[in-house]
Amino acid sequence: MKKYNLEDFKLGWLIGDFEPSILRTDQFEISIKKYSKGDYEKAHIHKLADEITIIIVGKVLMNGGEYKANDIIVIEKGEATDFKVLSDTITVVVKTPSVPGDKYIEPHLKLSGIV
């Protein structure tokens, strides 16, 4: 048995083709991310990976749509999304495959109307 602490991993990313990683694999990535109300991630796309975001706790705005605890959002490769935190939130994110650097900011897009 091994013990890890989520705080030891970069932005909650704990499995994937990167270090540190509990399991190094190029097949998928998993993160458990904590956000505070008001946090915002600019619109971006993944050219190679599909992403599944599960809202465990909290409420967020993605592409102008509001999502809450227990919602599962599937974002296909090439589909842009932004992410505005409406209340303190915890997510689980799965991306497949795991491709380091496969995040491309789309600065001209304001999908949730955030300026």
Language model: regions and residue ranges:
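A short hydrophobic beta-strand segment most commonly corresponding to one strand
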Residues: 87-108
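Short acidic-glycine-tyrosine-enriched beta hairpin
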Residues: 63-82, 91
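A short beta-strand-loop-beta hairpin characteristic of the jelly-roll/cupin
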Residues: 46-71, 105-106
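Conserved short histidine dyad/triad with adjacent acidic residue
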Residues: 26-46, 77
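Conserved hydrophobic/aromatic positions in well-ordered beta-strands
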Residues: 31-33, 53, 92
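A short, N-terminal "cap"/entry segment at the start of jelly-roll beta-barrel domains
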Residues: 1-27, 32, 108-115
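A generic "binding-loop/recognition-motif" signal
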Residues: 28, 48, 79, 87-89, ...
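Short histidine-centered beta-strand/loop micro-motifs
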Residues: 21-24, 41-47, 63-65, 84-85
